[in-house]
Amino acid sequence: MTQPLRIIFAGTPDFSVPPLKTLIDSEHEVVAVYTQPDRPAGRGRKLTASPVKQTALEHDIPVYQPVSLKTPEAQAELEALQADVMIVVAYGLILPKAVLDMPKYGCLNIHASILPRWRGAAPIQRAIQMGDAETGVTIMQMDVGLDTGDMLTILKTPIKPEDTAQTLHDRLSALGCDAMMTTLSNLQTDQLSPVKQDERQVTYAEKLNKAEAELDWQASAQTLARQVQAFNPWPVAFTQYQGQPLRIWQAEVGHASTQKSPGLVISVSKTGMEVATGKGSLLIKQVQPSGKKAMPAYDFAQARQLTGQTLG
């Protein structure tokens, strides 16, 4: 029988919760959870605990929330936990070399891409946006670089035509649990075979910003449809209508072969509103006007008789 591992878990957002719950339910011992400090959230800007902290507290696991892991105090605290390994999932703090070297087996990271493609902050969204056929999760041995460590386990999944960043996020989070448990099992039985990343294949997934969510109707319908799916649920693709932002939650490549001016609403039907683009048409299915709830594009377009009007 292999000995259960003493594990420190470090993570912050929703993506990190399934791996933490998987570890709690496993034979291993989660000795502590590290997460970002509570942040103001919602309309009242009330201090709110991260999803990972909430999960840890529900299971009576000690929670640490240092602002930095670079101070001697924070490092002494972590070292005192005498962990075998630290699992890091979207934690959001830089781990200095001293911390990376503290646990017996170092620090392992669950990254939501097939490395070395899409190192960085937004691998899920960039994979959809660029039309990748597949993506996955990589478990890597962390080093001081950004997602540069040796790869220990890779699990893949196809990107489906209907995938949004949310659906892919949920699937990869679950896949990350499987990859993590496989890696820990291999670590316990000394069967890990680290693979170096090919630096020639590296691409970077830049952090998302709200400005890039605005649709450029000169682009192709294919590009715009991917943008809508990649930016759902945040920052949400949008266009302008009568000087107000109109969020677009759901869209797909339309069937109209059009030479019409990009941004022109060609037709409105029960399936949605079809808009001319730089190449082909985009069928918009769900929109959200400023200050209102999301609604079928058909309802929005019918009420305003949008056929023949221009968006953007």
UniProtKB/Swiss-Prot annotation:
**Cross-referenced InterPro entries:** Fmt (IPR005794), Formyl_trans_C (IPR005793), Formyl_trans_C_sf (IPR037022), Formyl_transf_N (IPR002376), Formyl_transf_N_sf (IPR036477), Formyl_transferase-like_C_sf (IPR011034), GART_AS (IPR001555), Met-tRNA-FMT_C (IPR044135)
**PROSITE patterns, alphabetized:** GART
Classify the source by domain of life.
Bacteria
Q: What is its EC number?
A: 2.1.2.9
One GO cellular component assignment for this chain's record is: cytosol
Per the record, what are the reactions this protein catalyses?
L-methionyl-tRNA(fMet) + (6R)-10-formyltetrahydrofolate = N-formyl-L-methionyl-tRNA(fMet) + (6S)-5,6,7,8-tetrahydrofolate + H(+)
Q: Has UniProt tagged this entry with the keyword Transferase?
A: yes
Give yes or no: UniProt keyword GTP-binding: no
Mind listing the GO molecular function terms for this protein? Answer: methionyl-tRNA formyltransferase activity
Q: Give the record's keywords alphabetically.
A: Protein biosynthesis, Transferase
Q: Where does (6S)-5,6,7,8-tetrahydrofolate bind?
A: 113-116
Q: Check the record and name the Gene3D superfamilies matching this protein.
A: Formyl transferase, C-terminal domain, Formyl transferase, N-terminal domain
Task of the protein? Attaches a formyl group to the free amino group of methionyl-tRNA(fMet). The formyl group appears to play a dual role in the initiator identity of N-formylmethionyl-tRNA by promoting its recognition by IF2 and preventing the misappropriation of this tRNA by the elongation apparatus.
PANTHER family membership: METHIONYL-TRNA FORMYLTRANSFERASE, METHIONYL-TRNA FORMYLTRANSFERASE, MITOCHONDRIAL
Similarity comment: family membership: Belongs to the Fmt family.
Name of the protein described by the UniProt record: Methionyl-tRNA formyltransferase
Q: Which organism is it from?
A: Hydrogenovibrio crunogenus (strain DSM 25203 / XCL-2) (Thiomicrospira crunogena)
Q: What is the lineage of its organism?
A: Bacteria, Pseudomonadati, Pseudomonadota, Gammaproteobacteria, Thiotrichales
